[in-house]
Structure formats: structure tokens, C-alpha cells
Amino acid sequence: MTVFRQENVDDYYDTGEELGSGQFAVVKKCREKSTGLQYAAKFIKKRRTKSSRRGVSREDIEREVSILKEIQHPNVITLHEVYENKTDVILILELVAGGELFDFLAEKESLTEEEATEFLKQILNGVYYLHSLQIAHFDLKPENIMLLDRNVPKPRIKIIDFGLAHKIDFGNEFKNIFGTPEFVAPEIVNYEPLGLEADMWSIGVITYILLSGASPFLGDTKQETLANVSAVNYEFEDEYFSNTSALAKDFIRRLLVKDPKKRMTIQDSLQHPWIKPKDTQQALSRKASAVNMEKFKKFAARKKWKQSVRLISLCQRLSRSFLSRSNMSVARSDDTLDEEDSFVMKAIIHAINDDNVPGLQHLLGSLSNYDVNQPNKHGTPPLLIAAGCGNIQILQLLIKRGSRIDVQDKGGSNAVYWAARHGHVDTLKFLSENKCPLDVKDKSGEMALHVAARYGHADVAQLLCSFGSNPNIQDKEEETPLHCAAWHGYYSVAKALCEAGCNVNIKNREGETPLLTASARGYHDIVECLAEHGADLNACDKDGHIALHLAVRRCQMEVIKTLLSQGCFVDYQDRHGNTPLHVACKDGNMPIVVALCEANCNLDISNKYGRTPLHLAANNGILDVVRYLCLMGASVEALTTDGKTAEDLARSEQHEHVAGLLARLRKDTHRGLFIQQLRPTQNLQPRIKLKLFGHSGSGKTTLVESLKCGLLRSFFRRRRPRLSSTNSSRFPPSPLASKPTVSVSINNLYPGCENVSVRSRSMMFEPGLTKGMLEVFVAPTHHPHCSADDQSTKAIDIQNAYLNGVGDFSVWEFSGNPVYFCCYDYFAANDPTSIHVVVFSLEEPYEIQLNQVIFWLSFLKSLVPVEEPIAFGGKLKNPLQVVLVATHADIMNVPRPAGGEFGYDKDTSLLKEIRNRFGNDLHISNKLFVLDAGASGSKDMKVLRNHLQEIRSQIVSVCPPMTHLCEKIISTLPSWRKLNGPNQLMSLQQFVYDVQDQLNPLASEEDLRRIAQQLHSTGEINIMQSETVQDVLLLDPRWLCTNVLGKLLSVETPRALHHYRGRYTVEDIQRLVPDSDVEELLQILDAMDICARDLSSGTMVDVPALIKTDNLHRSWADEEDEVMVYGGVRIVPVEHLTPFPCGIFHKVQVNLCRWIHQQSTEGDADIRLWVNGCKLANRGAELLVLLVNHGQGIEVQVRGLETEKIKCCLLLDSVCSTIENVMATTLPGLLTVKHYLSPQQLREHHEPVMIYQPRDFFRAQTLKETSLTNTMGGYKESFSSIMCFGCHDVYSQASLGMDIHASDLNLLTRRKLSRLLDPPDPLGKDWCLLAMNLGLPDLVAKYNTSNGAPKDFLPSPLHALLREWTTYPESTVGTLMSKLRELGRRDAADFLLKASSVFKINLDGNGQEAYASSCNSGTSYNSISSVVSR
């Protein structure tokens, strides 16, 4: 942006008389103080906002200045200097004081063509100079052709006004519609490309007028003029051209040519015989021919008359366009104008509305006898309209022209009223100084202070009060300004009036005080302000309602809290005897009932009909309110005036559920017992959950058994036999002697994942961890489904146990067998009151130990959703408690001093690495516990016990204490489990109903939600929550976690060929779990994404976790009969490059099965599954989904016919959306990103395939490139071919990486940025400086936390900054990256490079018709909620 001189122009120049004015500019004579030289100062009004139409845009001003700076010619005006202030840009120009050329010529008695061409030649010379610089003026007309000095023998022409001038770039097409209709070229009218030729047309028109005094194309209307121009409709009439030479007419004809290419250029015109005669005869013909001076003088006179009228029509045009804008004030509306108003009145009002002071001044100057006090048709004089618009200059002008300061409109309002209505403080000061009356009432009894309050102008109200305006004046409705403020909710106005000393207890005609008005309308801040200034809280209206009654009736909870905190009378009765509690109970508003009861209201007050609040609630059948009133001690035996109890009223209205509750509470002893059950006791929560995670053989079961052993029992405890004696492949005796190969370990955990790219750019492993990552798992050489150990844990083993020296626990041991992982998301990380123990064996090499721990911690972290709002530094409020335990220290001969603890030499480095990665997400104990899992009495085991006991005590201390009802439910659960039989699932609603029906009728749903959460914490039940499972209680976790899933997923011997593909009949499932209701069980498993039912076949069920078939269809066949297009993506984790939890791919397969079954209604969709892969065919396109790169990526490859590119795009988008939905719902804490596969290598079936990462696209985009180099193939591939199969329709509607709006950054990305930028940086390179760079400095003061306050639970300032900044349309990911780099935060910018999406499709609804159902592709046919609801 060009920066002009910011100094005050008045410091350097003395400004004098006005020389002229335009729409947005005024030209004044000025004198330079330092030299005494005279110049013209052109004041151009700047446009305030982009959307505004008032003023000139910055771009247009800078263009005019740049052109003026470039030009220097005797016939063109020159620029001296440029200044700028808040409202204007001031151009200091050469003073052209000779007036217009045409005015000068009109004064002559006669003029030959020869004399005329001398002036015209100067114009042509000036235009020749401009065109040589490729500058087109675009506004050549008589008014812009001036004389430098008319008093010299040969006056010099000056071309002025370069406001429309443009530098023509012949490489870029330029179109616009501008200029004066009489002089514009046809290409402007027709909106065709413009060039220098447009000026030549204007010269032709000027010449025509100069010679004849007539305008060639002028019509009666603007439209007619433009039509004449477009049609080139002109002629040389004898009346005007009788004395005109043939050469002059030829000159004009060659210029007024419609085709710009055939029009004379400036060079041609200078060589034309009329301008430059070729012989004496041509020269003589010019001398003999004369300008038609009679007509020319008439033209000049007519022009001056038009200029007089033009001011009025200009005002009319400007204000009409102004009135159509959306940002006009209330005064600037059509209520001040009418077609029946005089033309002059309209012009005056238009000029006022548009702040056109010069225009109004000219207009009034030409209307010497006009009475400016006369009103328009609506009875509003101009002075009042000007007061409403707030322009003091116009007020001064009107008063100077005779406007009375006390003039009123037909409603009795004066100028103060109008200014107050629109909030013009300076205008009010001006009116007050000029003695305009303040407290004039209009016909409705209102004065200025009323209207200021009604429109929320606190500064105006404050000013009027300071001027002495009476704040207690009432209008015809007896309302004060404070009533108006209270009704409309203007706190600042109410505060100003209260501080001015107004009476806060005046009542209006309805008997309402301002407090009653504000309370009814819910303005708690005004209520608080009024109370602080002495408002009577118990003042009542005509119906006896106090403020609390009205707030309760209108459900204004914040007002109710304010009134109660201020001490209003809570038991006040209205004229019917109803207290606020009566009103709340009748309406059934539970939160208000609770608030009133907590304020110690009387529960048993009777109204005039003898009814207590309990009677009203019972009569209306509001069970929750009845229950709460009874709990709080309301009398159930109270009688109405006609002798009825609350129970009688409920029965008469057939509210049997209410009547039944009241019947059970008749005896006070029963009610007392129920109330006692709900009160907290001194008993602490008896147990919490201990969850153990680790790979098979890490010693989890042994560790639990050892922790259960007491001191005496530990002497007699027999060690569990080591499996290495019988299965050396599973537990090698020495990691050095029997180190497993990569292929063994990876094939067993991720069969079929070995086809990874070997080039460094395609590998997903982190530097330094590659070795360990490739050997993460030491699994049996057989397929993991073939269990080699009958003693190994099946699914999730759950037991209640007392751990000696620690306390009672519900112990949940999660099997290390990957086949069970697909069910862990419902149980692993759903309780922050649990202790999570990650166990690993020291038998493994250090790299494998580290990566096993990373695997499980990534799993736990991924299961925890992001909390909103994001906390300071991205921290979690309740991170999971994690303890790391290393086993087999005895076998590995870890050194241990006599009687001391094992000393593992790598514990510090392992803990440091783990805490660096997961310290913000998990609460990891500071110590790594190294022990022999079988030595229950060892020192190491004792240290672990002590640590677990400390954590347990800490957790239990913050858990709510037990209630008798909770203990009662625990004792009742066994009988409920027995009653439920094969289905141990129950909805929360059913649980609430059963407890209320069988155990305690006074327990509310909120009470029982808390109790259910406590039972969940103890492990008695499990609350299951997800998108498909909401508020479902698993009454017996062992039933599902151990019995059902343990049996179903550990199936060993297939009974049929299709079992290898994981397909089972309903009968097969029934045989696997014979004790369960198979239909309900399948719906449960379906909702958990463990299986997918094929509704088309009716009896088949897909269970991907049980698939044994491997390596089917892992790549496309080479034979292709038709031309195909290829494309694909790889979905990978962004941060920690560990394998996806195996279960996630099973869930992906389940959802893809479900999705393809939804698509296959026409029989053209098919899916084939195998271990870690599947192949889909749908509507002519084929798709592979593969788990690759040792489980660290999910690849989606699509191919289809060249003619079906859009189908391929939609299929890829739908399947990726399905996978991303599964990720988001199952692993909400895992951030993933899409990398793109080389379509050319996919087409050539070339492996390894080049992987394009987001940073590749961003780098290319920065360099303005639209293709990427395939370094493997040595060729380039375009963005469109990589991302959308070369489909230009899709590509054109998409946003690319840098241009994607920053609001698309997901919460996990924002949380990571908060973690990087929230903490104060020593060099200031944190969120504060970023806020300044993004243009939001106000947020720094608002969210700055450097005041020593604890930061743990403060909201993230970076998150707040992004939320604010992304409301602007120009906030793109690319802008954010560049701002971060400018800040010096390359770490944050590089993270964005890794995590940001590079392609966002914005397809319209029509394009997605084929895959409309993909929107909910991750949604199960069933939800557990629907299962248990029956």
C-alpha cells in the first residue's frame, strides 16, 4: 500500500477559496508557505470500508496518484505533492486558473477552423504523450480541458482530472463502465475490452461539439444517449454544419467509428490533413470554414444551465443511492422523502443525507428566496433531518440561511430530540450551545431523554442529564426514561440514569417500576444495577406481582438468582395468594423450583383456593417437581379448601404416576428413610478400577496375582510355569540368542502389511526409532487367531480383588492379543478415576520396549476426546493416571543390591522420552517400576504397592462419598443381573425407573446419573457412550467383556470355507455364544462396530477380526481392456508414528461392509475382505483399502474408466469420509492426515509408489506451480491428476492447501498449536505477538494470563485467537503459516505443514446424488440404545 505524507497539510499550505467540487472531491486554491507559489489542492474523500459506496477507494486514489506522478507534459496537469489524513487524500496540483476552453471560446465573436485546430492540436499533443505511456484518460470532455492562463496571447491547454485514467496492460483484458454518457465510446457502453481507442472517440465528440455547438449523441434521457452511442447514431445536419469543411467532417467520421481497431489512432489524427494540411488548398479550406459560433454560444449557455440543475440532480442521485445502502442511519430513510415533495425539497434532503455540504451550499446559494424552515410532506423541516444526520457543518449552514433553532416537526419533536434519537453527542453540544430547548415534549409526552434511552445511547443520556434534563419526566404512559432503558435492555443507559440520580421506583400506568419491567424481560444486569441504587425489590404491580413473580413466570433464571441474592421476599403472595413457588410448580420449571427451595422459601403456603405448590404440581402431573418438593419436606397431607390432598388431585386428573408416588410417601417414616438414603454418608468409595495393558506374555496376569498376595501367602505361592519351555518361539530364552526377524513380528501382528515403500520419503517411521518400530511385537509364528496358550487372557478379564497393602479394586486386564482390540474403545479410557498400568517385558530389546509403551499410550491418548474450550497449553482437565511397569527383571539379570530395588540403566531415558511425548495428555508417574512380576513379597513390589495406594487414596478423596442408596443398588445388582438373563444391557432411563419403582421414589434422574457414574467408577457397571451407544448401562461387565467377546473373538477352528473370510451365519454366532439371545447380541456387536450384518443376505454376518484369508487382491490386475484412471491416498497419524491400534482397521472393514450393503440395492456393489485389506466394486469403479507400512497407514486406491472420473472422485471421497468418521468416533484424540499416491505409478502397477505429503503441495503452491515431481519416475504429475483423477469439474470447485480457510483446522490441530504458542516465550514469540501480527491486538489484553493466576484451567488464548480470526473470510491456512514464520515459530508452521489438509472438495448437492447415503456411512444399522429400549 502506498504511503502518502502524513503531516498536516495546513502546516505547509494556506488553503483559500473553493475552485470546484465533484462527487467525492473538492478543489481549493492554496499557497505553499515556504515558496509563496500557488497550487490547487484536491481533497479526495476516502472510502471508509470496502462495502461503503461513499468516497473513493484506496486503490482508485493510488492509481490516480501513480499516473499523475508519471506524467510531465506542457498540455497535461502536473502533480506537486500528496498528503493524507484520516478522511481525505490531498493532491497538491498545478494551478490551472484559466477556466474551461469552451467558456473561453464562447466569448469570441468568430472562430475559424484554423484557429480551432490550434487548440485541438494541443489536446492531441497531450493525448499523444499519454498514449505513448500506455495511459488512457477515459474521461475526456469539455469540462476537463482547461486553460493555464486565458490572459496570454496564445493560451496553453491543460488536460485535467485523471480519476478514471488507467495504465493499459495489453496482456490483460480490461473492462469497465464509467465516464460521461455523451462522451463515452461504444465499447464502454457494451462492456467490451477497453484501450487507448476510447479516448479517440471522445476527441471526435469534442470536435463535433466545438465545430457545431451540438452534441452528436445527446438524447432526452441517459438511456437514449447510450443507445445512440452504441448504434453510432449521428449525422452532420446542415443547420449546424453548413460552414464546416469536408476535411473537418472526415476527421470526425474517422474518429466516430464503432470498431476500435478501425478508429484513427492518436498518431493518425495528428497526421490528418485537417490538423496538418498537405497542401495550400487544404490550408485555405480551413481558413475559409468557420465554427458555428451562434450554436456554439447556445451550447455553452445550455451547459451552464445544466450545471446549475446538475447540482440538484446530483444530490438526488447521490442520496438515492445512499438511501439504498444497508448501513444508513434511521434518519436516512424514506420517511423523510416523498414523491409529492418539491424537487428543491428533495434535493435539500438528499444533500443533507449524503453530508454534501458543498452541494447544499451551492444549492441554497442559488435559492435566494427559499424558506428553509418549511417542512417536507411528512412535517419534518430540514434542520431536524440534519440534526438526525449529525452533520454540524450542515446545521451551521441551515442556521446561517435562516433555520430556526427551536423548529419542531408535526409530532412536536425538536432538533435535540432528533439528535438524541441517533446518538449524536457533538451535535447535541452544538444545539445546546445555540440554546435549543432540552426538555421539549412531543405529542406522546416523550422528550429527548426518553428517545435516547429507547435507542440505547448512554453517552447521550449522560450528556442530557449533565445539561440539566429532568430524568424523572413521565410520558403519557407515565413511563420515565429509566422504564424505556429497562424495557429495551440497555444497561449502560440505565446505569447512567441511576448515577444521574433518577427516581428508580416511579411506577407507570400499569403499576410497574423499572425493576418489574427489567425482571420480566430478563435483563439481570439492569436488575442488579437498580437494586444497588435502592430499587424496592418487593414493589408490586396492579396484580400484586413483585419482580420475582414476573421473572419466575417468564423463566428468567439469571434474574431470579440476582433477586434472591439481593434479598427479595421469596414468599410474597400476589392477589390470588400465589407465591413465586406456586408459579414455578404450576409451570413445572425444575431449575427454578430448586433455586427457590434453596432460598428457603416456605413450601406449604396456600393460595386463596387452599392449594399449596405441591397441589399445583400434582394437579398438572409434573412428577419431577412433586418428587423434589416431597424430598424437601413439603406436606403430602395438606388439604385444599374443598378438602383434597395432592394425591386426590393427581388421581382426578389421571396422573397415576404422581398419585402412586404420593401414596408411597404418606407415612413419614417411609419418606424419612428415602430422604436419608440420598444424603451423603461418611463412607468413601469402596473401590476404583485398575486397568492393565501390555503385549501378550508381558506378565499382566502374574502381576495381578502377585499384588493380591499377602505376606504369608507369598511364601507358599507357586510361580506360574514359564511358557518358554514349551513355546520357545513365543518367549525366546535370550533376546540375543533368539532374536525374532522383522518379518515374523510384523507378519503376525499385521499380516500383509509388508508391501511398504522403501524410499525414505515414503517411510512413516521416525528417525532413531525405525529399528524398534519394525520389531515392536514378538508374536507367535502362527496367525494370532490360533491361540498357542490356553492360559492367556481372553478379551478383558474382570475381577474384584483386594490388592494387599493397596486396597479394593475392580481389576480389568486387557488381553494383548490383537484380535480383541476392536472392542477396547468402549472400556479402555472411559474413566478418569481409574489407574492405567502399562506392562512391558525387559526380555525385549530397548527399542521394542519403548515402542510397546508408545503403542499403548498412543492408544490411550487417542481414545480421549478433545475438550472444548481448549485449556491453556492444550492440557486436559482430568488426564488419565498411568503407571509404567517393567517385568522379567529377574530373567534379564537386572542388577539389584542386596535387599534393594532393581536398577534398570535405561529407565531415565525411557521415562524422559515417554513424558516428552505424552506429558500433556496423560498423567504419567515419575517412576518406572522395574520388578519380577512373580515376586509378590519383593521390595520392588512393595514400592509399587505403595505408589498404587497413594494414587488410589488421591482418587478416592476427590470421588463423591457413598450414599445409602448407592450401597443399596450395589446389593440389588446381582438380582437384576439374574432377571436380565442373556442381555445385561439396560438404558439409563430404565435404570432410573427401576430404582424409583423398587428402591427409592424420591431419587431424581440427576441423583441416579451421579450414582450410575459412581457405580461405573467402582466397576460394578459400565456406562457405554458413543455416537451409536448413548446412556447405556452394562449391568455385568464380565458378561460382555469376558464371556461374550472372549468366546466370540477367540474362535479357533473354522467350520466352513467362508469363515476364513470372517463371514458367519446367525446360527454360527449362536453356537459360539449359546447362552445369549443372538439377535439382541448381534445388534449390540453391530452398534459397537465389531460386526456388520448383511441385510441383503439376511443371515450372514461379517466379523473382520476373525478373518483368516490373507493376500487376496492386494493389487490391481495388469490386464486392462479399457483406459482407466487411478488415484489414491494414504491416511497416517500426524504426530507419533506408531501403528494404528489393530482394532481400528477391523472397524473400518465393518463400516465399509455396512456402507457397501447400503449402496448395493441395485446389485452392482460388492466387497471382499481379507486380513488387513478389502476390495470394493461400486458403479463401475473399483477400490482397495489396505493397512500398510506395518500398520502405520491406511491406503485407499481407486480406479475406474476414463469416462467416470467424477464417480471415482465421489467414491474416493465417500470411502475416505467413512474411514475418517470411524477414526473420529473411535479414536477422537488421534490426529490423521491424508498423503496422496502417485496415479502414474498406480496405473503402471509400479511398487513402491511415490507418496506426496502436504508439505510437497504447499511448497509447490508457494512457487505458483500446479504439479509435483515424481522423483522415483522422473516425471511431473499435475495436482488435478493426483487429487481428483484429472477431473477438472471437481478440481475447479475445490480449495487447495494454502487457500483452505483456517476455520477448517480441526480441534486436535488447534490444541497442538495451543500447546506450542500458549506458554510465554522469552523472546515474545508466542500467541500475543501472533495476535498483533494478525491484526487483533484487543485480544492480547483480554486473554493475557501473565498475572500469576494458575494456568491449568484457563482457556487457551491461542484457541480464542483462532476462533476470532477465522471469522474473517481472508483467514486462510497459508496466511496463518506465513504469519507463524514471520513470528519465528517454524515449529508451529512446520506442524501445520504436516497436519493441514491440501484438498477440500466443495461439490454441490447434484454432484453427490450418487453417494448421498455416504453422509452417515459410519453409522450402525443398530444402536445399543435401541436394543435395550425394548
UniProtKB/Swiss-Prot annotation:
Domain annotation Roc: ranges: 681-955
Effect of S313A: Minimal effect on activity
Organism for this UniProt entry: Homo sapiens
Positions of the Death domain: 1312-1396
Activity regulation note: Activated by Ca(2+)/calmodulin. Regulated by a locking mechanism, involving autophosphorylation at Ser-308 and calmodulin binding. In the inactive state, Ser-308 is phosphorylated. Activation involves its dephosphorylation and a release-of-autoinhibition mechanism where binding of calmodulin induces a conformational change that relieves the steric block of the active site by the autoinhibitory domain. Activity is modulated by UNC5B and NTN1. UNC5B activates it by inhibiting the phosphorylation at Ser-308, whereas NTN1 inhibits UNC5B-mediated activation of DAPK1.
Active site per the UniProt annotation: D139 (proton acceptor)
UniProt-reported outcome of changing S308D: Reduced Ca(2+)-calmodulin binding and Ca(2+)-calmodulin-independent kinase activity. Decreases apoptotic activity
Documented EC number(s): 2.7.11.1
CDD domains to which the protein is assigned, alphabetical: Death_DAPK1, STKc_DAPK1
Protein name: Death-associated protein kinase 1
Tissues where this protein is expressed: Isoform 2 is expressed in normal intestinal tissue as well as in colorectal carcinomas.
Disulfide bonds: none
GO molecular function terms listed in the Swiss-Prot or TrEMBL record: ATP binding; calcium/calmodulin-dependent protein kinase activity; calmodulin binding; GTP binding; identical protein binding; protein kinase activity; protein serine kinase activity; protein serine/threonine kinase activity
Stimuli inducing this protein: Up-regulated following treatment with IFNG/IFN-gamma.
Record's keyword terms, sorted: ANK repeat, Apoptosis, ATP-binding, Calmodulin-binding, Cytoplasm, Cytoskeleton, GTP-binding, Kinase, Nucleotide-binding, Phosphoprotein, Repeat, Serine/threonine-protein kinase, Transferase, Translation regulation, Ubl conjugation
The encoding gene: DAPK1
GO cellular component: a single term: DAPK1-calmodulin complex
Notes on the domains: The autoinhibitory domain sterically blocks the substrate peptide-binding site by making both hydrophobic and electrostatic contacts with the kinase core.
Protein residues bound to ATP: 19-27, 42, 94-96, 100, 161
UniProt lineage: Eukaryota, Metazoa, Chordata, Craniata, Vertebrata
Pfam families: Ank, Ank_2, Ank_4, Death, Pkinase
Family that this chain belongs to: Belongs to the protein kinase superfamily. CAMK Ser/Thr protein kinase family. DAP kinase subfamily.
PROSITE patterns found in the cross-reference section: ANK_REP_REGION, ANK_REPEAT, DEATH_DOMAIN, PROTEIN_KINASE_ATP, PROTEIN_KINASE_DOM, PROTEIN_KINASE_ST, ROC
Function in brief: Calcium/calmodulin-dependent serine/threonine kinase involved in multiple cellular signaling pathways that trigger cell survival, apoptosis, and autophagy. Regulates both type I apoptotic and type II autophagic cell deaths signal, depending on the cellular setting. The former is caspase-dependent, while the latter is caspase-independent and is characterized by the accumulation of autophagic vesicles. Phosphorylates PIN1 resulting in inhibition of its catalytic activity, nuclear localization, and cellular function. Phosphorylates TPM1, enhancing stress fiber formation in endothelial cells.
Region span, Calmodulin-binding: 267-334
Subunit structure: Interacts with KLHL20. Interacts (via death domain) with MAPK1 and MAPK3. Interacts with MAP1B (via N-terminus). Interacts with PRKD1 in an oxidative stress-regulated manner. Interacts with PIN1, PDCD6, BECN1, TSC2 and STX1A. Interacts (via kinase domain) with DAPK3 (via kinase domain). Interacts with GRINB. Interacts (via death domain) with UNC5B (via death domain). Interacts with UNC5C (via death domain).
Example GO BP: positive regulation of autophagic cell death
Cofactor(s) in the UniProt record: Mg(2+)
